[in-house]
Every structure is written in C-alpha cells, then in structure tokens.
Amino acid sequence: MSSHYEDLLARLGEFLAGNKIDYMIIGGFALPSYGAIRVTADLDLAAWIQTPLQFKNFILKAEISGFKAPTASFSNPVMVLTDHKTGLEIELWLRPDGIVWDQETLDRRRKIRFASSDLYVVSPEDFIVSKLARPDRGVQDEKDVKSVLVRMEGTIDRKYLERRAARAGVLAILKAIDRI
C-alpha cells in the first residue's frame, strides 16, 4: 500500500471516529482482509448518515478536515470525496449497493489494522452478499466471493450469510459459486 493511501486511511479514520460517524470500508479495499489480494485503486466507504441534517453537518466537517465533496447530495446513494492533501478520491456510500444497511450490518463489521490505523471493514458475509447483489456484478466479483469463501472456510457465519443472500435474491448464485 502506498504511503498516500496509508496517510489517507489514517486521517479518514481519525476524522470519522472523531466525529462519531459509524462507517465501514467496503469493496476492493476490504477484500485482502478476507480473500485474495489484488490491486485496486478504489477506496469505497459506507457511512451511516441517515438524515439530511446529519449529511449537511458531515459535509461541513469533512471540508474543514481537508476532504472536498463538490457534488454532494443526500438524495444520491454515493458521492465522491476528494482528499486535498493527496488528491485521492473516496467513494462514499450512504446507501451501498447490495448491502442491507442496518444496525446488524454495523454490529458485524470488523476492526482491521490498515498500515498504522485500526479501521472498520464490512463483515466477510456482507462483503460476499454485496459482491453478488451488485447490479453490475462481473466475473471478478464472483472470483472475489470464491476467494473469501475458501480463505474464511470454517469461520463464516453460514446461517447469517444465507439469510442475507436470500434477502438480496442471490442465494442460488452463492450456492453455485460455493460448489465450484
């Protein structure tokens, strides 16, 4: 991981924790925690921001902390934050694709060490479901799912995974990938 990403993750984690914003890293940056390691430049983050007022306050605090959100709108499920210091972009999801975004999801996220920072990452079960439930799911997403199933075998909460997969309408594809 480059020093720019390490710096960004450290400052982002401090900002979110300091402002008591529940969050979790999702997408490709979460994958090495549970599955295959592959290169990705996308930093996707889900933040628990439930009202327009919370959103407005978040944007103000983010800009004070060095993150710019030029096209921010609470009505959009995702927006881009740009870090002034590194120029790197963060996709901030208010309503992430493929994840039932609720208290149970937050309770199941895991704290993982990234470089010098402890950050929250989506649970392996919710990672799997989110990859399968994406409207633009591709072969790489299915490979990512398989790598997590193999690496985390014996530690995944199968009952929770299958319940969430059924709710998202992806239980059949999960079972097919699991058999491969």
Model-derived regions, located:
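Compositionally biased terminal segments of proteins
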Residues: 1-180
